[in-house]
Amino acid sequence: MMAFLLDIITFLQISFSTNIFRINYKWVSDGYDEYKKRLSKLIPLELIELPIAKRTKTGNPKLWMEQEAKTILGKLNDSDHLVILDVNSKIISTEELADKMQNWKFNNPNVVILIGGPDGIDQSIKDIAKEKISISKMTFPHPLVRIIAEQLYRAYTILEGHPYHK
């Protein structure tokens, strides 16, 4: 069993004008749940969903990101190894993710992977992140990025020599 904990922090709601609604892709939730279950025998995995800042038509995205940063900081511990998913960072392969997981196993007791809000991640959070990675240059709905759980499972199977990756 790997000797670290893994948390994924994401934002739960998307807001347009005054309407706030949950995006619920059941197939995404089902997929996340499946890989969480597979990983649970190997690595404790927790999904932490945070509310986004209230948006208005005339609001300021920079202020929204600052508000979301305060929420994120309230969830982080000093010992957390913060990894942010950032479209402008280096795209990594599954094999590179496996290498990172191997490093986390020996050097970081609690890894937090942050999926930013609809407007991105505030600079104050980027400044404290230990690592910044990109899974793609494409834009995905934020709930869909939870598929990172499959990549974490796949990376772990690479480390264990399991045939899942082939």
Curated annotation (Swiss-Prot):
Keywords: Cytoplasm, Methyltransferase, rRNA processing, S-adenosyl-L-methionine, Transferase. GO terms for molecular function: rRNA (pseudouridine-N3-)-methyltransferase activity. It is an enzyme of class 2 (transferase). Pfam families: SPOUT_MTase. It is found in: Cytoplasm. It catalyses: pseudouridine(1915) in 23S rRNA + S-adenosyl-L-methionine = N(3)-methylpseudouridine(1915) in 23S rRNA + S-adenosyl-L-homocysteine + H(+). Specifically methylates the pseudouridine at position 1915 (m3Psi1915) in 23S rRNA. Homodimer. This is Ribosomal RNA large subunit methyltransferase H. It comes from Francisella tularensis subsp. holarctica (strain LVS). The gene is rlmH.
